[in-house]
Amino acid sequence: MYLLATSITGSRAAGLLAGIAFAFLPYRADKIPHLQVLMYGWMPVALWGFHRYFSTGHRLALTVFAVAFLLQGLSNGYFFYFFSAAVIVIGFVELLTRVWTRPRMIVELAATAVLMLVSLIPVATAYLNVGANQALSRSRSENIMFSADALAYFHASPNLVLWRDILPQGAPEASLFPGFALLTMALIGLLGSFTKWRDGRNPYAMARLGVSYFLIVLIGFVLSLGPEPTYAGTLLTESGPYDWLYNIVPGLDGLRVPARAAILVFLGLTVLAAIGVERLRTLCSPRLAGVGCFMLAAIFIAEGSYQAKLIPFPQTPIPSEQAAYDWLEQQPPGGAIILPIRPRDPIVNTLRYVYSTLQHRQPLVNGYSGYGTSLIRSIETHERDVSAYGDLLRGLRALQVRYLVLHEHRYEDQAWMQQTDGPLISAAIRAQAHQLVAHHRFGTSDV
């Protein structure tokens, strides 16, 4: 963000403050469980390259944009879609201004777009094929559930130190308060971009930037409201722009949380705030500007400060599991599956299984996602059917799963399993001796 804001304003002070604001967004407070949502740092780098290309015509800058855009999208698939909106806005506005003097831009931009699409074919093809083959898509009702209300931008995370007891608390995906300092400076930047600058800057160029980033804010805001935009819980329309795009853009039905389009709001506000900082700085004495910048940086940091409530993980290891994983670590590489596949508290225990791969180093069938694979669903369906383990083991062998780990102590009396299932299932697997290379017992864990 420092690069982008500095290149736009010509001021290192404005760039530094924009970088601080973007790094300390209050939005971060609820996103520790979804670290991939915080991987938005390539956006300003890409836009920096994009602006440089339009201002200089250098193809190296266009390459920087393309690489940063791809890195951003591959870091988080949501941003392939949402960040594309920002790129389209900047590209459209800049082309309207510059294409008449440099028509070759159209050819260069088209060639770059084709190369970017070609580089994404392996990932996009796999993504779309898996989605089609396993019917992996997010329903409209899910999108509505994870959309932001218009007032969510004044709802604070309960983790925020400064605002949690003052502002209304929002849901984890809908606590979108950007901070009053950022909002104020962005408003000053938007208005200031249409005024005459004392240092002789091109007022048309500054106005163009102000309009561009305001459009990015507006688009992000509208998209974050999801298929059925609401204000204070009141339905504004039964079908909004996100709903229209949902039906025509390939792969968009794989996104669950429209509220994450708010990153465009924060991106646009930060750039506008940088313009606002520079606008005020040119109106003040150097000493006053320095004090003001220092105070503003402190406010950005204070508004974005939060206290994370983390649960210690992993818990104290169970000796039998530890012994099983120690043994597994010494074995040749091969796929592994750990039973029960739906232990008590599925999310926490499945994550424990995934965490165990750091110890035993074997690739794991188990995993947690918003989606369930057909393999996991099949195993869940037949896990308690001891007569099905002959076919189950044959299927796992066909998939080159080499190790099966069973923890008897993780079977509990629940709706989907009973405490007595562990020994029964262990016996059913051992009865398939002709399909087993070896069996090892570690307390209440079998491998």
Give names to the regions the model predicted.
Residues 1-96, 109-124, 296-305:
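Membrane-embedded helix bundles of polyisoprenyl
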Residues 6-10, 51-64, 92-107, 191-204, ...:
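Membrane-interface junctions at the ends of membrane-embedded or membrane-associated helices
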Residues 114-118, 180-207, 211-224, 276-279:
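Hydrophobic, aromatic-rich transmembrane alpha-helices
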Residues 139, 298-447:
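Extracytoplasmic
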